[in-house]
Design a protein with these regions (language model features):
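Mature, structured domains enriched in cysteine- and short glycine motifs
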Residues: 2-106
Length: 106
């Protein structure tokens, strides 16, 4: 499995590492999930856990018109995956959910 977690509490340079990963993996997927998920599959996890394509402007600073930061430094962490199956499996493992919501970009 090839997943990569980008979390400012775990990596000092998570924001630049995330941007580099997005550039290097244009056909990949990103799980957007809360940093402090306990993996219990609760309503908060269901509400905030989503899978996006790397090309989605809501999770990709390269796709926005203005320079935006804070993709990995706020409440959320990003998990990069090379395939949709890997993204789904990691999202379920991290959140404890049985099903994961997809952004319309997927």
């Amino acid at each position: 499995m090839s997943t990569f977690t980008f979390n400012s509490e775990l990596q000092q340079e998570s924001e630049s590492a995330y941007r580099n990963w997005l550039s290097d993996n244009p056909t990949g997927f990103v799980v957007n999930t809360l940093k402090h998920s306990k993996g219990l599959g609760n309503r908060t996890d269901a509400r905030f856990t989503r899978i996006h394509r790397v090309t989605c402007k809501s999770i990709n600073p390269h796709k926005r018109k203005k320079n935006t930061t804070g993709f990995t430094t706020g409440r959320y962490q990003k998990i990069g995956a090379l395939s949709l199956d890997e993204a789904c499996n990691e999202a379920m493992r991290t959140s404890g959910l049985k099903t994961i919501k997809f952004c319309p970009c997927v």
